[in-house]
């Protein structure tokens, strides 16, 4: 790491008078995240881009600006990038539901639901965030109590991972699903009499989500703006929004083009015929704040709901290997479409069976080293023999470090010691291509990218558990973790030439923190606060 880089503007020495800038910051510790990880003191910004970056004396002597800010030694970083999240669904679904996260029993879920119902009286009573792995015993709930409390109102409670729902009998009636006509019987949980308990997984769960009435456009816009404020307050300036339908993309596009929204969004399209005709057939779209060049596919479910597709049965449920959500033939057809039209494929794969299938299917098209940057989202459990395929075919593992520290309490009983030892192998995966993008997968995890940074380096929860870290051999260094939420995250979306580092000519997306995450005790990182967030040289958050 080189401390205090020389000024980064080729013709700067030729100026005899000071050049106008919109913004100058100085007396800062600016982590540029350049190739050499240079550190600077000051930066000049104009028209949303970085004019120059270097020493205090150089920047102040060569530039004058309307806004000049003395940061008094505070640490500055490139705007944080969440490579994989669900921004639109968080805003327009989760924020419009009862928040069930952190509930320690089903009784607590019912209490939270009651408060929400009495306050809002919705036509559909919905909540999100329950996790039976946090309860004692760790069993899936059933809908008996829901039927007693809400016999005539449909209720849908989405599990924390989004891959399972608990619904009451009224919701099942409205969906028209019975034990005899359900398309995939493995996507429902049954009682000892062979009847639905109310828990549905994967595509069966999606049936209920689709029945919930959507907010009107104006309400959606309000919710999106609220969610954007949250993201800016966490230092996020760019997001990868994973899995959007046509209507959601068009709404985001209209709001971003008009400037109502300012977040930079990399769209991953749902693999629907409507999206293929509307977007993919016309080729990639690159605008100032929205990029459309990726297709999101689900290969399997999640570990928490035992939907992740495994090569062998779950340790705690013999005979159950999870659910494969897409056939090889279907994935192959999507890959061909993407390949032919210059689109990136981003496939959710958590179990080792799903990861193997995706890796092998990708390899049919990639044929060795390449720069197509096809991604596997999550890559949580990968068979040892399959790990080298990431490097062999330049396949990018897009991971979420907090998944490891959220799942570590129960993953051993779910997978057994051998498989769990090789799970969440982020350092090993990073080494395959020498870089790795990171994200949060919010609302499944918390939005805060500093939690991602902390989990990636410490492999611990915020209480310091376990001592020494969960599988610490797969921890990232602080520099690697920082790159994973900045320049490597930008690279995962083909945007490393525009953002992800603070260098002359790049977008002036940056965040100012109240402490230096690169030098403070690691245990203090989760308490660090964002002081200011800038997007395109504009202050979008000030504490």
Segment roles from a protein language model:
Residues 15-26, 31, 35-278, 297-354, ...:
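Divalent metal-binding segments
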Residues 86, 290-307, 394-404:
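Non-cysteine beta-strand/loop elements that form the S-adenosyl-L-methionine
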Residues 79, 275-278, 407-411, 448, ...:
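Short, charged, surface-exposed secondary-structure boundary motifs
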């Amino acid at each position: 790491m080189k401390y205090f880089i020389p000024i980064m503007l080729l013709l700067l020495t030729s100026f005899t008078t000071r050049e106008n800038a919109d913004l100058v910051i100085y007396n800062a510790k600016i982590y540029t995240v350049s190739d050499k990880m240079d550190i600077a003191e000051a930066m000049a910004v104009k028209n949303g881009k970085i004019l120059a970056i270097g020493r205090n004396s150089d920047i102040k002597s060569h530039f004058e600006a309307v806004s000049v800010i003395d940061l008094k030694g505070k640490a500055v970083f490139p705007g944080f990038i969440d490579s994989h999240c669900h921004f639109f669904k968080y805003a327009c679904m989760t924020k419009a539901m009862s928040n069930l996260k952190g509930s320690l029993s089903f009784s607590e879920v019912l209490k939270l639901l009651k408060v929400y119902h009495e306050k809002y009286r919705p036509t559909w009573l919905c909540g999100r965030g329950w996790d039976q792995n946090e309860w004692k015993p760790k069993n899936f709930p059933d809908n008996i109590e829901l039927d007693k409390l809400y016999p005539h109102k449909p209720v849908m409670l989405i599990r924390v991972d989004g891959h399972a729902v608990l619904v009451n009998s009224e919701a099942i009636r409205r969906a028209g699903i019975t034990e005899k006509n359900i398309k995939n019987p493995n996507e429902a949980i049954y009682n000892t009499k062979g009847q639905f308990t109310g828990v549905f997984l994967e595509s069966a769960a999606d049936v209920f989500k689709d029945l919930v009435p959507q907010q009107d456009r104006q309400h959606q816009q309000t919710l999106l703006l609220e969610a954007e404020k949250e993201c800016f307050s966490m230092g996020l300036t760019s997001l990868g929004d994973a899995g959007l339908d046509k209507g959601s993309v068009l709404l985001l596009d209209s709001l971003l083009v008009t400037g109502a929204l300012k977040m930079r969004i990399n769209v991953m399209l749902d693999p629907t015929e409507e999206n293929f005709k509307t977007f993919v057939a016309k080729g990639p779209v690159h605008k100032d704040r929205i990029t459309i060049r990726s297709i999101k596919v689900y290969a399997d479910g999640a570990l928490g709901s035992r939907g992740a597709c495994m090569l062998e049965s779950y340790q705690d449920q013999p005979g159950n290997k999870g659910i494969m959500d897409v056939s090889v033939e279907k994935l192959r057809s999507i890959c061909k479409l993407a390949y032919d039209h210059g689109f990136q494929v981003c496939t959710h794969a958590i179990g080792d069976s799903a990861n193997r299938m995706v890796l092998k299917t990708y390899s049919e098209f990639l044929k060795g080293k390449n720069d197509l940057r096809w991604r596997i989202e999550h890559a949580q459990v990968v068979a040892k023999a399959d790990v080298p395929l990431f490097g062999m075919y330049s396949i990018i593992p897009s991971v979420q470090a907090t998944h490891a520290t959220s799942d570590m309490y129960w993953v051993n009983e779910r997978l057994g010691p051998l498989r769990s030892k090789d799970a969440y192998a982020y350092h090993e995966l990073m080494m395959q291509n020498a870089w790795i993008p990171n994200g949060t997968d919010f609302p499944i995890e918390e939005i805060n990218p500093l939690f991602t940074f902390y989990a990636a380096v410490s492999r611990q929860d915020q209480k310091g558990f376990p001592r020494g870290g969960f599988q610490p051999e797969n921890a990232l260094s602080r520099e690697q973790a920082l790159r994973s939420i900045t320049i490597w995250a930008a690279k995962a979306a083909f945007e490393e030439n525009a953002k992800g580092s603070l260098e002359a000519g790049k977008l002036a997306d940056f965040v100012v923190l109240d402490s230096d995450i690169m030098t403070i005790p690691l245990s203090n990182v989760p308490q660090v606060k964002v002081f200011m967030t800038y997007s395109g040289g504009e202050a979008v958050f000030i504490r």
